[in-house]
Every structure is written in structure tokens, then in C-alpha cells.
Amino acid sequence: MVLISGGLGYLGGRIAKYLLDSRFQVRIGSSQSHPDVPSDLLSCEIVICDLSDKRSLENACKNVSSIIHLASLNAQECDHDPEAALLINGLGTLNLLNAAKKMGVTKFVYFSTAHVYGSPLQGIIDENSTPRPMHDYAITHRLAEDYVLQANSDKDITGSILRLTNSVGSPLNSKENCWMLVVNDLCKQTALNHSMELHSDELVQRDFIPISTVCSTVVDVLTTDVLDGEIANVSSGTVLTL
């Protein structure tokens, strides 16, 4: 059984469907008691996964072999409430790790962000580059990374960290809060208005990676030991401007 925290979100929903299609048993953790579940995920077990509630986390981790931890505040939410960002992204990850260890989970895959390297990202970056998080979103993800690395070092659980760049693709749920992302915004404008207007700096360089590639990477991490105890940048390796 694989538990996906945040499994009804933009990326989590796509990963959940991909795992289902790959014949994994999937349990989705949600902070909501009655979430809106896309039709593609109706066969999944849905459980409460409140990152501040240790009992709900232990219940979510029962009979689970691996966890994909995606639940977090986004960049805008972190900027608006840095204290909540620390409690959810940072300490919430620690709470889930502790529940996972207590319930015998063997593998913990944490989705972090390439923004831990700095903002804006500059130069050639690899996994040996020194992290320099510059805003609350990156700072709290970096903190969570350290908790995962600590648990892995203590041999309490096998932890892996995936530092994601800009994943692009359609959501399972059209109501998902993902339409402010630049590629999604342009696609939505085209569909609704038959025109596009760029609302961000056209000179900013970005690395885009298809969500389908992210999903296949997750399967590789779950089914092999190639990234056990490791940090990996999940990116295309190609920088583009708009």
C-alpha cells in the first residue's frame, strides 16, 4: 500500500492515477473530511491526513509500505503566513515521519523544490550545489528535507528527496488551484479566449518537466533502491524562456 499525502492535489492526483494504472494499491491522505474526489480516483481509499494530528497520521500509515509526501502550503500561502508554513511544511513533515516510523512504513519519498538552491535560480545546479533558500516556501521545504535525511541516517526509515522544478500538465480536477502556473495559465487563456497574454517576466528562465515524467520517476523510486537515502533534482535539464 502506498500513502500519498496531498494525493488529491495538482501533482498528487496525477501521481495517484499513474500508480493505480501501474497496479499499486493507493491510499490518499487529505486534510478534508469530505473532499472532492475525481472519478479517476474513486477506487482509492481516502483517509484524513492532518499534519498537526498525530493520531490521524498514525491511522493513515496503518498497513502502508511507502509514503509519497506532497502535502504542503504553496509559495503564495507561505508568503502570506510564514508561521503556518513552518508548522505544516516543516513540523508537519516531522509528524508524518514519526507516525510512519511508529507504524512500520519502510520508504518515505519527500517532494521538495528546486527553490531550495536560491531565488532566482542561477548558473549550473546539481545535487551538490549549496542550498540557499531565500523565501518561506523554500526555507520550510529545506527544513523538512533535513528531517527526512535525519530519519534515514538513523536507519528508522528509508528516505528519498525529490527536488522538483516546474512540472507541467493537466490536473485531474479542473477546479484544482493550479491555473496561476504560467503554462497552465496560457493554456486556459487559449481555451477560453483564443488568445494568450503573458502575466510573468518573459526573460525569466525556467526548467519545465512533464508531470508524466515525474510520475514515472516516482515508480522508479518506489520499486528500486536507486535513490534510497539520496537527494535528486527532478528536472528536464533544459532551460527555457517564454
Predicted regions and their residues:
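NAD(P)H-binding glycine-rich loop region in Rossmannoid oxidoreductase-like domains
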Residues: 45, 51-88
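Glycine/proline-rich active-site loop of Rossmann-fold NAD(P)-dependent oxidoreductases
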Residues: 142, 155-157, 167-184, 194, ...
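Glycine-rich NAD(P)-binding loop of the Rossmann-fold in SDR/ketoreductase-type enzymes
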Residues: 52, 84-95, 131, 135, ...
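SDR active-site strand-loop-helix element
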Residues: 5, 29, 67-71, 108-113, ...
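Active-site Tyr-X1-5-Lys
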Residues: 119, 134-160, 165, 191-192
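N-terminal Rossmann-fold cofactor-binding loop
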Residues: 29-33, 51
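Conserved Rossmann-fold NAD(P)-dependent oxidoreductase catalytic core, especially the SDR/UDP-sugar
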Residues: 94-136
